[in-house]
Amino acid sequence: MKEKKKGNIIGILIVMAIIIFGVIYGGITLTKNWGKSKETISKENATGKLKKICKDININEVEPRKSPIDLGVKDVKDTIPNIDKYPAKVENTTDSYIEIFSTGEKAGNGKDGWLIDVANNFNESKFEINGKIISVKVREIASGLGMDYIISEKYLPDAYSPSNELWGEMIKANGKTIELCDDRMVGNVAGILISKEKYDELIKKYGAINLKNITQAVANGEINMGYTNPFASATGLNFLVSTLATFDSSNPLSEKAIDGFNEFQNNIPLIAYTTLQLRNSAESGILDGFIMEYQTYINSPELKTDYIFTPFGYRHDSPLYSVGNLSNEKKEILNKFIEFYKQDKYQELAVKDGFNALEDYKC
């Protein structure tokens, strides 16, 4: 009797389970589309429909079209900072003075501070012109940036000393008044530094190391080399001009020269804004060679140990220009300053700082 009763209970439970399952399933079926539009529901079968639609789509490849980009810059003046970003390294000590823009290898710190030492000594000497004590003010400005200030006339110094004469020629080409007063403050040379291992490899293949052979080695993918931005760096600009000339010495801007340079450029892994970036890349093993001035090279023991210096291009003798139409008083101050730093003791100081070497090298 008990077994019969137990069987009835099990049967009832089974029937109830079937009924509950049916109710739940039916509820889900009836409510699963509640709140959904027909459009939403149809997306559940999107894959199948998309396949049908794609069969009717034709694909045409269109050649990419270059479109002019408006950077919104109307003037170079808008792209360079206010001069306050570059405070004077030597302040004038009198009201009668000239201000000089100078590059960092001679207006920097330590061995790069030759002009700073000279200017301070000049000011301490208290020279007079027409009964007035005179002085100089020195601001450290890179060659390219100094040119931008002068061309844009955002800020005009009285005198400008880039690393080489290429910048002065560009300023003249832009119609600005600039006059070469001294073609050499201190002697210096641009060069290519090549690791000793790579140098030996190139000697075996080419027999000599010069700019022409180096550019050929780069074009052949035999050496990884970097250089600095020619719009900012004097060494970079010198390298650009000199490299173009290796492809066509009669016309560095000819199609032949440009094609040769483009082939060369395709194998350049790095164009850096500063020499420091190049040095860091070389230390990491990315580069076999890079460009640098001799004065910096000779003052860096680790570079002399690992790299060989090969000079190239125009000399970097730090010419000195007057800027604009100077008053007679300012012209006299400038001439007095030139006379001052030309003294043997200041040229000997320049030698101690790494300048006035490789005197026999000519472009």
Q: What does each model-identified segment do?
A:
Residues 182-191, 231, 261-264, 298-327, 331, 340-363, ...:
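Periplasmic-binding protein-like
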Residues 3-18:
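N-terminal Sec-pathway targeting helices
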Residues 13-14, 35-232:
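N-terminal segment of the mature folded domain
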